[in-house]
Amino acid sequence: MPRAVNALHFELDAGAETIGWDLLGLGLPASGEGYTRGRFEQRIEVIAPSGPAWLERGVLDFDDPRHAERTRRLLASPLGWDGRPVLGMLWFAAGAPLEERRRERLLESARAALPEALAGGATVPNRHVVVVRALADRVEPLAEGLGAVRAAWRREAWQLEATLPRVWRT
């Protein structure tokens, strides 16, 4: 059966900051083919000088009969993926704790930039990280929405223009 592992690991120095994102599209929604078999595991971790700052881990598993029904419910439930096949996460992480006012400004700018058409939200899991998670029916609208938040964060955090990474244009 198809298996995929997506593991991202970031170690940040005390003065370092980063913006990262991950988009996951399940199945082939344009062809009407949902995700109904295989196993996907994701692990995203950010390590600060003081230790682990953030760990995001998820598993979708149709291969193991013990987990297949739970995976099906998670993908269908309004408390889970709500039937949407695309999940996106965008995060701002810092090696040193962010001041409360700065965290609030990043949170506010994320909420203002995230299109209302996307099912998503922004949160601050701890003093090092601000996270946006969103669901969609297609990858493109989600990528555009998270791109708008990324642009807002670049302006807010670093007073930089919203230039796109070259790899996004290929």
Region locations from a protein language model:
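A structural signal for small-residue-enriched, beta-sheet-centric alpha/beta enzyme cores
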Residues: 24-170
